[in-house]
Regions:
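Bacterial N-terminal signal peptides
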Residues: 3, 21-33
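Short loop/turn segments immediately following beta-strands, especially the blade-tip
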Residues: 79-82, 135-143, 205-216, 270-277, ...
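Acidic, Gly/Ser/Thr-rich repeat motifs that build Ca2+-stabilized beta-propeller blades
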Residues: 36-185, 244-247, 252-264, 289, ...
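Conserved blade-ending motifs and adjacent loop-strand segments that build the rim/top face
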Residues: 356-376
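Surface-exposed loop and turn segments in beta-propeller and other repeat-based domains
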Residues: 86-99, 147-162, 200, 211-235, ...
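Calcium-binding loop positions in Ca2+-binding modules
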Residues: 63, 274, 333, 377, ...
């Protein structure tokens, strides 16, 4: 068995580096498979009285602002301390919020700091069609020019399954995720929209919006750009309601939370650099199950299977999220964070070295969650969806019950037992500017320990500081003369057999 440090608690963005004399508490747990247990998370209220939040994002302009999209057709700005009274944008009568319709997403140009451009995704109040429109900021940085340009409309026959996500990929193209058209079983198979490549419903679209003199152009690398009878905007297909998808800001991988029918919710995956063209299966498959809405599957169709599924036992609808790449919760690094709308549970999915995915509950809430958001630093936010003043935005934080600045995972617990995989030990790492780093940790008599260090948390980069450390039943202090000063370090202690 091994005791593995989960990470370094921090009170600011970025990884903790000891540039002055100080103490860091590092959580440690016992694990038979050497994998980190999920951190204990909590939610910190950052903005309230926000009715029916549908999306949370940032502009990438260094301002630190969050832009909160409301279903009724408004975009609000949270400036770090308060929600500004004046709307950033108000679509007015262009859209009407209700059910699954309304203003659903906002995406800012990668060059927003200089060009001031952003795009919105909404359902048109006149006929329910899906609309993507381009807007720009006014001379006031906190107010948009109300005059926009619709770049794409998609007829949508039913009020649900509108999709709703807009996001720029690492390639600079704008991705959009319209749903399959609504009702159940893809309009009961009358048009089989998600598998019909002549339609844009039930797809992931990829658009080049860099030329503002036109609406959009087709990226030449789109998979169906040369196929007759196929809409060239299509990047992937076979999706039911890809309500939320996101790109991993570190790897560029794409993760799609696709809302299921009556049995299975799923997360679909696409590696960075993929040529596109994936068929994610709907309505031939739901999750891993073939034939939910059809009489079996067609043998000559290749379906890309989801990486994760969960059933409807107490749950109903996935709200896709992000892979965590912030600095405030190191043990959450690389974890795909998502939720279920009905249960209010927030989950974390991790990928093993072998490539398989597994999921665990990170925290449970008492409210409906429709969306996650990522700020410019990679910290994650989640909404409380409500049609009254209870609507709010929260930031995911490392739980700190007593408010002393140290997460609960780093606090010494009564009856701490290094042999109990549910127990935590207290570790103190001290990094003065003119001496060796030292690490202090609790021990048990007649047990042997090994102290290890890494500077980057890469699994293969752990080095042994000291081996065969004999436990005494009291805390031991071990020096690490090989650790550079003025540098961040991560430590773990292994309980040897």
């Amino acid at each position: 068995m091994a005791a593995v440090i989960a990470g370094i608690p921090q009170s600011s963005y970025g990884c903790a580096g000891m540039n002055r004399r100080g103490v860091i508490l590092i959580s440690m747990f016992l694990s038979a498979n050497l994998r980190a247990a999920p951190p204990t998370l909590d939610l910190k209220l950052v903005a309230n009285q926000l009715t029916n939040v549908t999306a949370i994002t940032h502009a990438g302009d260094g301002s630190g602002r969050l832009f909160v999209t409301l279903q009724v057709g408004q975009i609000k700005i949270f400036n770090g301390s308060q929600v500004l009274a004046t709307n950033f944008l108000n679509l007015g009568t262009l859209t009407t919020g209700g059910g699954e319709r309304g203003l659903l997403s906002t995406a800012f140009s990668p060059g927003y700091a200089t060009n001031g451009l952003f795009w919105v995704y909404y359902t048109r109040s006149s006929d329910g069609a899906l609309a993507i429109a381009r807007y720009s900021v006014s001379t006031n940085a906190n107010v948009a020019d109300p005059n926009g340009t619709v770049i794409l409309t998609i007829p949508h026959p039913v009020g649900n399954h509108n999709g709703g996500q807009l996001q720029f990929g690492p390639d600079g193209y704008l991705y959009a995720g319209p749903g399959d058209g609504g009702s159940s079983c893809d309009l009961s198979g009358s048009t089989n929209n998600a598998q019909n490549l002549s339609l844009l419903l039930g797809k992931l679209l990829r658009l080049d919006v860099s030329n503002v003199s036109t609406t959009y152009t087709i990226p030449p690398s789109n998979p169906f750009v040369s196929s007759n009878g196929v809409r060239p905007e299509i990047w992937a297909y076979g999706l039911r309601n890809p309500w939320r998808f996101s790109f991993d800001r570190t790897t560029g991988d794409l993760l799609i939370g696709d809302v299921g029918q009556n049995a299975w919710e799923e997360v679909d995956f696409q590696t960075a650099g993929s040529p596109g063209g994936q068929n994610y299966g709907w309505r031939l498959t739901e999750g891993f199950v073939c034939g939910t809405c059809t009489n079996g599957c067609t043998n000559n169709i290749t379906v890309t299977q989801p990486i994760l599924v969960y059933n409807h036992s107490g749950k109903c609808s996935i709200s896709g999220g992000y892979r965590y790449r912030g600095g405030a919760i190191p043990p959450l690094a690389g974890t795909y964070v998502y939720a279920d709308y009905c249960s209010g549970e927030i989950f974390g999915a991790t990928q093993s070295l072998a490539g398989t995915w597994s999921s665990a509950t990170l925290t449970d809430t008492v409210f409906n969650i429709t969306t996650f958001g990522e700020d410019q630093f990679g910290e994650l936010y989640v909404n409380r969806y409500s049609n009254d003043v209870a609507g709010a935005v929260y930031r995911l934080i490392w739980k700190d019950t007593d408010g002393d600045g140290m997460p609960d995972d780093s606090e010494i617990l009564a009856g701490t037992d290094p042999n109990n995989p549910n127990s935590f030990l207290r570790i103190i790492a001290t990094g003065p500017s003119n001496a060796d780093w030292t690490v202090t940790f609790g021990t048990v008599s007649n047990k042997l320990y090994r102290l290890e260090r890494t500077d980057d948390l890469v699994v293969t980069n752990w080095v042994t500081v000291t081996n065969n450390i004999a436990g005494t039943g009291n805390p031991l202090q071990v020096a690490d003369p090989g650790a550079a000063v003025e540098t961040q370090h991560f430590y773990r202690v292994r309980l040897l057999p």
